[in-house]
Amino acid sequence: MDYRRSGFTISTDKSRLDIEVIHHFLDNSYWAAGRSAETIRRSIENSLPFGVYKGDQQVGFARVITDYATFAWIADVFILDDYQGQGLGKWLMEVVISHPDLQGFRRWVLATKDAHELYRRFGFDELKKPERWMERHDPNTQERPDYWKKNT
């Protein structure tokens, strides 16, 4: 599915994604530094990705992890620095939230350190009951040299 505005395109076509651009940005982000290209490929295979393009050049990205029934997690959202300030992040979120396959969910979640105001525009807020949420965190699991060999 493609969306067009002012010379930019947002597409859910996985074949258009530039893994090198995505990997380079994520490797320099606060939330995914050190994530391997293979881990990124696998994460995209198992989610609904949204690429943002200026012509054929990828300039942004987001992905949604979902069961397509009740729950969605928005992850890895970015717009390259040279393209920020043009409303692309807001437009990307509009497209994600309104995607026809992502309607009727009881809960959407995401994590951010620095974009709270952007996400508030789309109805996101702090967890109402954070005491109910737990996580299991092993930041180096996928980056072990033999991880994907044992688990594929």
Would you name each region that the model predicts?
Residues 1-35, 130, 145-152:
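Short amphipathic alpha-helix that is part of the acyltransferase structural core
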Residues 38-55, 60-78:
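A conserved beta-strand-loop-helix scaffold within acyl/acetyltransferase catalytic domains
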Residues 83-92:
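Conserved acetyl-CoA pyrophosphate-binding loop and the N-cap/start of the following alpha-helix
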Residues 102-138:
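Conserved active-site alpha-helix within GNAT-family acetyltransferase domains
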Residues 140-143:
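Short helix-loop capping/hinge motifs at secondary-structure junctions, enriched
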